[in-house]
Amino acid sequence: MQKGQIRVQTENIFPIIKKFLYSDHEIFLRELVSNAVDATQKIKTLSSIGEAKGELGELRIDVVLDPKEKTLSIIDRGVGMTAEEVDKYLNQVAFSGAEEFLTKYKDANIIGHFGLGFYSGFMVSSKVEVFTKSFREDAKGVYWSCDGSPEFELYEIDKADRGTRIVLHINEDSEEFLDGYRIRRILEKFCKFLPVAIYFKDESTKADDKEAKEEEESPINNTNPIWVKKPSELTNEDYQNFYRELYPAGETPLFWIHLNVDYPFNLTGILYFPKIKQSYEIQKDKIQLYSNQVFVTDEVKDIVPEFLMLLHGVIDSPDIPLNVSRSYLQGDPNVKKINAHITKKVADKLDEIFRNDRKSFEEKWESLGLFVKYGMMTDDKFLDKANKFLVMEDAADGVFYTLEEYKTAADTLQKNKEGKSVIIYTTDPVQQDAYIKAAQGKGYKVVKLETMVDAAFINNMEMKWDSVHFVRVDSDIADNLVDKQEHTDMVLSKEEEEKLKGLFGFKVSDLNLNVEVKGLSPDTPPVIATRPEFMRRMKDMAGMGGGMAAFYATMPDEVNLTVNGNHKVYQALLKESDTAKQEQQIRNLADLALLSQGLLKGANLTEFINRSVALLS
């Protein structure tokens, strides 16, 4: 029997392990089960090359909870350890590495691999015992124990089977881990896809609890998830079934991308494009990161480009650097390469679907558009590829145009005086119907840009697309949507024009009205209310938040009232001798225009209704 003290200055290491090293105490179980899996995989490898003799037996991992004894055991039939290996790996290597690291990076949040996974057990234990026997011929059983101080016990024991049993004596502060339901949930969370079968047994389960007993007889994990298989071996049904395994309540995904790279880095996984409805809250953090099938985290913003955080699925890579608890990503060149690779794979997949099955691509655009537009705003490499498959839907006939197709369809008709192509868009085809029809009457193409990201997308693309200018269909009268400096003659005299402008000089609460009399087509409405493009965009951006959001949100709405002096209604109105009636009719024309923009509310709307009834009486 050997008693001793770990041969480095370790008094400060255990408190750090217990309190600071791991962000979440429940991952102690992941670390210990992962070690058991590693030991099991090693014995399989050694057996296959003839270095481990004898029968392997059933290779499984058992997690056994005994609430009465306040112990949790992790048992494997892996390679095991000799007394020398126990001394080396448990008493020397881990601690010396930890001490060196902690001295150098005491205040840093970047923690490297130092074999401390085993010591995570001390976060929840008053004592840890190890019973182990190496696969080597003539190996003896070994017992090791430690109570969290630098002192340990190490001696030989009789042990029949190869492998390791770790017994955690759960401390008073951690008695939540004596709950069988809690342990099973932790195993399902972290070990769901480990490559060795894991069984969980709760000694407190009653003998007549058939359901619990059946659970104990089944492994908690799927040892062969589809992302470790070759894409050629899988069917669409396999991918859809795996999606349901990950997200039981989720709708069938639109499509998926199977990642399978082994050089210059290792990366496997499956990314799914979910259906997204604009009215539903979008959920991020749905991608799960694994390392050799061990769950690490669902916070993958450093690996997956931000615009793809809306995707669902699994990424598995042993080349992604993690801290000792496998919970925080470190800065690393591989991460950047993986990020770029995922972006390229997504862009290539979208381009492939667009080219090979455009009809299907357009049918999925309601969901895909959000990914594509967000990506174009945030990733220039993705932008270069996406310029070819971004599509915009015509508000009139539902035809989809790429950017170049829209430019061709609009031709010279929608080029302004600066030579830029003017993309006319609607954010609400129903409310803006009159403006859309007026624009279409001039031969213009109006497209729908009505999603939650479009306000930012429009501003962003105008900076990236030199030859394009966006104009909302209700931001000006149809004649002015494309600024060509063309004018229509006015039928009113200068004196009549000034008089008409004066009649529209009333005030409307909460609105700043700018009145202009113009000579438009006689078929154009008598009054058109529009909101200046710049101010409307600022209001849209304010709705999305940001530094100037509060400032623009409190500003009154700026509204341009364009009075069509060529409309026949004014010929009679200007001659009306009843001044009160004339003012009421003028005000009604203005209110109808404001109503079309959704700007007539509250008391102003009530007044309009009462006035309309009075005029009809």
Sequence positions of predicted segments:
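GHKL (Bergerat-fold) ATPase N-terminal catalytic module, capturing the glycine-rich phosphate-binding loop
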Residues: M1-F177, R185
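GHKL/Bergerat-fold ATPase module in large chromosome/replication-associated machines
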Residues: I110, V128-E151, N171-S174, Y181-S617
